[in-house]
Amino acid sequence: MSFVPGQENAGSRSSSGNRAGNGILKKTTWADQTERGLNNQNRGRKNQPKQTATTQPNSGSVVPHYSWFSGITQFQKGKEFQFAQGQGVPIANGIPASQQKGYWYRHNRRSFKTPDGQQKQLLPRWYFYYLGTGPYAGAEYGDDIEGVVWVASQQAETRTSADIVERDPSSHEAIPTRFAPGTVLPQGFYVEGSGRSAPASRSGSRPQSRGPNNRARSSSNQRQPASTVKPDMAEEIAALVLAKLGKDAGQPKQVTKQSAKEVRQKILNKPRQKRTPNKQCPVQQCFGKRGPNQNFGGPEMLKLGTSDPQFPILAELAPTAGAFFFGSKLELVKKNSGGADGPTKDVYELQYSGAVRFDSTLPGFETIMKVLNENLNAYQNQDGGADVVSPKPQRKRGTKQKAQKDEVDNVSVAKPKSSVQRNVSRELTPEDRSLLAQILDDGVVPDGLEDDSNV
C-alpha cells in the first residue's frame, strides 16, 4: 500500500475553503503552482496545473513533479546546504520512519535587472522529494548529482524506493516543512512560511479570470493585470529597494569593535545564570575558565558559545525551569558577604544536582553523542590543562621605561684623560723645574710651584 503524507489528518474540508483536506493551510509555492477553481467564469474549461522550468513536457500532457513540502530558501551567499547524518527528512503524518528517505533538489531561480542596469541573481531554493519520485526518480540513493543532497532517517532502507505516491496539486496542498526535534537547519537558509521571511512565491493564490479577452491581451505582449503576482516578486522588490539604497541584500550586517563591546558588556551586566555566551562574549568571559567544576566546551564551542551550529541539538537536552526546580536536588547555602570595606549584604547560593536521561530512540541520538564526546572534559586534551583558550598576552606597563633606566644606571662615568683634567696634585720633577726655569725671565722657580702645581 502506498503512503500519502498527511492522510491521517484527512477529513471533511473546512467550510471556509481555506484549508485542505489534511488540515493544512493552503499556500501556493513553486512546489504547488496551480490555478484555483474559476467557478462559473471558466466557461467549462478544465483547470490545468502550471508547468515548471524543469518539468516542461516535450509533447502531450505530463503531470509535473510537485513536492509534498514547502521549500527551503537560501538568504546568505556562500552557505552550503547539508544536514547531519540521520537528519533532513521532513516529517508528515502517516509516513513511517522506514519511508523517510529521499533528496533535496536545488531550484536555480532566475535573475532580474536592477535599476542601475546590473543583473541580480536570486539565491536558489530547495525542495524535497521522496526516493523514487521527483525529477530524479530513477536515481539511486547516494548518486553524485549536481544540485542534489541525499537525506534519510536512521531506520530507512535506502536500497529501495519509498512507497510514496506523487502529489496531485488538485487534491493535495503542499505541507509546511517541519523537522524532527534536534534537527539543525543549515545556516543561511530558512523554511518557506516559517516566519523568517514573507513567502516569495504566491502565484495562483487568487483565482484569476482568463476569458478570451484576457488571453488576447496576454498574447499581444501587453501589460498583465496588476493583481497578478509573479513568483519571487516579494524578494525581487526587496532586492530592488536595497539596490536603490546602495546595499547588498546578501551582505550580512558587519559587527564593529564598538558594537561587539556593547553586546559583551550588556551580557556581563546580567546575573551569571542569565548570561548567553556568543561570538561577542565567549564562554570563558561569561563563566570562567574550563576545569573540573566547569568541564564542558571544546575550543570551537568556547569561542562561538550558543552561536555554534552544534549547540541547538544540545539545547534539546537542557531542562526546563519546571524540571530544574522539581526534578533536581536543591540546597540553599549562605556564603561570605564579601570584604570588610564592601557594603554589608547576605549572599546565598542555590546549589543543585540532577540528571537528564535519554536513550538511542531520541531523534538525532548519534549527533548528540558525537557532540557530547567532543566537548565533555575537552579541557583535559588541551595544552595548559584548564586554560583551553590561551589568554591574549598583556604588555607589561613600564617595562620600556625601566629598561631605559637600567641602561643609564649601567653606563660607567668616563675617566679623566689626564691628571690635569682630574685636578690631581703631584710633586715637580727635575725636568719640570728645568723647563720652568727657561720660561721664567729671572730663572727662579716660584716657591708656590715647588711642591704643588695646578698647570
Curated annotation (Swiss-Prot):
Spell out the GO cellular component terms annotated for this protein, sorted alphabetically and separated by semicolons: host cell endoplasmic reticulum-Golgi intermediate compartment; host cell Golgi apparatus; ribonucleoprotein complex; viral nucleocapsid
Q: Which UniProt keywords apply?
A: ADP-ribosylation, Host Golgi apparatus, Phosphoprotein, Ribonucleoprotein, RNA-binding, Transcription, Transcription regulation, Viral nucleoprotein, Virion
Binding-site positions, RNA: 109, 125, 167
User: One GO MF term, please?
Assistant: RNA binding
Q: PROSITE patterns under this entry?
A: COV_N_CTD (PS51929), COV_N_NTD (PS51928)
Looking at the record, which segments are called RNA-binding? 56-197
Give residue numbers for the modification (Phosphoserine): 170, 194, 390, 425
State where composition is biased (Polar residues). 30-42, 49-61, 215-227
List where in the cell it is found. Answer: Virion; Host endoplasmic reticulum-Golgi intermediate compartment; Host Golgi apparatus
Sequence segments annotated as region (Disordered): 1-62, 159-230, 271-290, 382-429
Q: Enumerate the spans annotated as CoV N CTD domain.
A: 260-383
The segment annotated Dimerization runs over 267-384
Q: Does the keyword Calcium apply?
A: no
Q: Which Pfam families match?
A: CoV_nucleocap
- Basic residues: compositionally biased ranges: 393-402
Residue stretches making up the CoV N NTD domain: 64-193
What CDD domains does the record tag this protein with? CoV_N-CTD, CoV_N-NTD
Q: Residue spans with biased composition (Low complexity)?
A: 9-23, 193-212
> Where Phosphothreonine occurs, residue numbers?
177, 429
Quaternary structure (record)? Homooligomer. Both monomeric and oligomeric forms interact with RNA. Interacts with protein M. Interacts with NSP3; this interaction serves to tether the genome to the newly translated replicase-transcriptase complex at a very early stage of infection. Interacts (when phosphorylated) with host DDX1; this interaction is essential to produce a full set of subgenomic and genomic RNAs.
Record function comment: Packages the positive strand viral genome RNA into a helical ribonucleocapsid (RNP) and plays a fundamental role during virion assembly through its interactions with the viral genome and membrane protein M. Plays an important role in enhancing the efficiency of subgenomic viral RNA transcription as well as viral replication.
Q: What name appears for this protein in its UniProt entry?
A: Nucleoprotein
Q: Which organism is it from?
A: Murine coronavirus (strain JHM) (MHV-JHM)
Its encoding gene is what?
A: N
